[in-house]
Amino acid sequence: MTEPNNTDLLDLATPYALHAVSIDERFEIDRWLATAPPEVADAFTDEVRSVQETMAVLSAATATEPPAHLRDNVLAMVADDPVRDLGSARRRRGGESRWRTAVLAAAAVAVVGLGALGVGLALRPAVSPTTADQVFAAPDVQTVSGPIPGGGTATVVFSKERDAGVLVMNDVAPPKPGTVYQMWLVGSDGPHSAGTMDDKAISPSTTAVLSDIGTSQALAFTVEPPGGSQRPTSPAFAELPLT
């Protein structure tokens, strides 16, 4: 493996997290991390943690280990980026690694397919799991992740072409009694409700399909009264860009 620059090193975080590198390659990556700038090493660690947490969605949602074929499917998706050539990899989609897009999309779709939507989310009418499959396979599939105040992360795998997305929330605390989390698809004409989550809907790993994302520029989260609101009544406590 050719010694990477800092951007290339971050591209190696997902195959590293998936144990999709050889022992020798893992040793080389560890050596490069030891001499990398602190901010790069921290970003690498955060990326590894994010991938591992997302893969853990499968076991949390089904009380079983992730299907053995999932890792093979992810690796097959990126077969044109061989591990031994990752030193020449480049960030794609404005900084989004194809490895990371593949694993996050695969994990989210696998969860939906295994029935993780049966958590009682008060979303708009349920969308067939095939919608998630279409998002996963879409040529314009993208992922975006961000921290949730108070702990946990939210990830959206989405496709504007398929007009849908898959939301995965890891280790997010439930709303306080007497309140709900409400999701909003935010576009040029303002926010539109994408559903609510009460304390019973939130689990260590919560997954939902988002439909009709249209030209929405962001997915925002607010705290609202039970049943939700027609318009946000509090500032967004988290927001993920959908552009």
UniProtKB/Swiss-Prot annotation:
Cytoplasmic-side stretches of the chain, per the record, are 1-102
UniProt topological domain (Extracellular) ranges = 124-243
GO aspect biological process, one term: regulation of translation
Q: Which GO terms describe its cellular component?
A: plasma membrane
Location of region: Disordered? 223-243
Name the predominant localization.
membrane
What molecular function terms (GO) are annotated for this protein?
Answer: sigma factor antagonist activity
| This protein's name | Anti-sigma-K factor RskA
Annotated membrane topology: Single-pass membrane protein
What biological function has been recorded for the protein in this entry?
A: An anti-sigma factor for extracytoplasmic function (ECF) sigma factor SigK. ECF sigma factors are held in an inactive form by an anti-sigma factor until released by regulated intramembrane proteolysis (RIP). RIP occurs when an extracytoplasmic signal triggers a concerted proteolytic cascade to transmit information and elicit cellular responses.
The source's domain of life comes to Bacteria
Q: Which organism is it from?
A: Mycobacterium sp. (strain KMS)
The record's subcellular locations are: Cell membrane
Q: Which family does the entry's similarity section mention? A: Belongs to the anti-sigma-K factor family.
Q: Does the keyword Transcription regulation apply?
A: yes
Q: Which InterPro entries match?
A: Anti-sigma-K/W_factor (IPR051474), Anti_sigma_zinc_sf (IPR041916), RskA_C (IPR018764), RskA_N (IPR053877)
Per UniProt, the keywords (alphabetical) are: Cell membrane, Membrane, Transcription, Transcription regulation, Transmembrane, Transmembrane helix
Please give the record's comment on domains: The cytosolic domain interacts with sigma factor SigK.
Q: Which residues cross the membrane?
A: 103-123
